Regions:
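Short glycine-centered segments of the SAM/dcSAM-binding site in methyltransferase folds
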Residues: 42, 159-160
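Local beta-strand N-terminus motif with an aromatic residue
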Residues: 40, 127-128
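A conserved beta-strand element that flanks and buttresses the S-adenosyl-L-methionine
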Residues: 131
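Short catalytic micro-motifs in class I SAM-dependent methyltransferases
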Residues: 134-135
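Class I (Rossmann-like) S-adenosyl-L-methionine-dependent methyltransferase catalytic domain
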Residues: 1-34, 50-57, 66, 70-121, ...
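A short glycine-rich, Lys/Arg-flanked "PGG" loop and its adjoining helix->strand segment in the class I
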Residues: 145-157
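Conserved class I S-adenosyl-L-methionine
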Residues: 40-49
């Protein structure tokens, strides 16, 4: 399925700008490479927007594969329902009734479901792969944990997550200090746990110190399998703009065990800095 109808749509800027087809293909290629995308997967797309990733996924998954996309912006869900579902009936889209300062301009608060009632639209332990692109970059810690915990509830045993975030590790901090990064993340979110790009709009873009990110992942019952660095901080070409994380549903979702196994496999010692010590000048 091509996405010409998304180009030039009044809501196209809400989903991040850029060429929808190229951006979606970039993301889906990374999902296939790192997220073990299989044609028969049942997929949950959290923050699906107008369906640009869904449109790209139609070329990768079986026509009978089960896909559910969720978002908080009514116009985007309406567009996806009208544009994709008639062609691919197994692709469904749900509207969540949640608030986010960055998107409040586009919201109506009589939505269909909230995060806590998401299971009404998706059966527990029914999802093989959850995708969340450019969602956790707009959430403070508490709603991020609530959402990731809800995703955990819906995944099958050994289910996996492909999610994008901004990670403030040593390499990213060096890029910020050298003015090679797109963002500086000098502010803090209201909880004080995350770094923010804008003080007057904290959820415009948030970044995770590695210790906080590790706590989030472990508290939600996941283990980190891989971190793919995004080109927002690399100063050069990359596979995705934001950092991509591959998570696996932990067999024993114990935070202490998760921390003990935390990941020299993916990050060198000292990469992470705790929030109280982190300050980008």
């Amino acid at each position: 399925m091509r996405t010409e109808q998304i180009n030039g749509h009044p809501l196209s800027d809400v989903v991040g700008g850029g060429d929808p087809e190229l951006v979606a293909q970039e993301v889906v290629t990374a999902i296939e490479k790192y997220g073990e995308l299989c044609p028969a997967d049942s997929i949950l797309d959290v923050g699906c927007g107008c369906g640009r990733i869904a449109a790209a996924l139609t070329q990768y998954v079986d026509r009978e594969s089960h896909y559910v996309g969720i978002d908080i912006v009514p116009g985007l869900i309406d567009f996806a329902r009208n544009f994709i579902t008639p062609r691919y009936p197994s692709f469904k889209f749900l509207l969540l009734n949640e608030s986010n300062k960055t998107y409040d301009w586009w919201l109506r608060q009589d939505g269909e479901k909230g995060i806590a009632t998401l299971a009404e639209g998706v059966s527990p332990k029914s999802i093989d792969l959850a995708i969340s692109v450019s969602l956790f970059t707009h959430l403070d810690y508490a709603p991020a944990l609530e959402m990731l915990t809800s995703i955990h509830h819906l995944l099958k045993n050994d289910g996996r997550v492909f999610m994008t975030v901004f990670v403030l590790d040593a390499a990213a901090i060096n890029a910020i200090e050298d003015r090679r990064a797109v963002f500086s993340f000098k502010q803090r979110t209201p909880t004080g746990k995350l770094n923010a790009e804008k003080s007057d709009d904290p959820t415009f873009a948030v970044a995770y110190d590695g210790g906080v990110l590790d706590d989030l992942i472990g508290s939600a019952g996941f283990q980190l399998e891989r971190h793919v660095r995004g080109y927002w901080s690399s100063g050069g070409p990359g596979e995705t703009f934001q950092d991509a994380l591959i998570l696996r549903k932990a067999k024993n979702p114990d935070l202490g065990e998760h921390r003990a196994k935390r990941s020299e496999k993916y990050f060198s010692a000292g990469d992470y800095r705790r929030p109280e010590r982190h300050a980008v000048q």
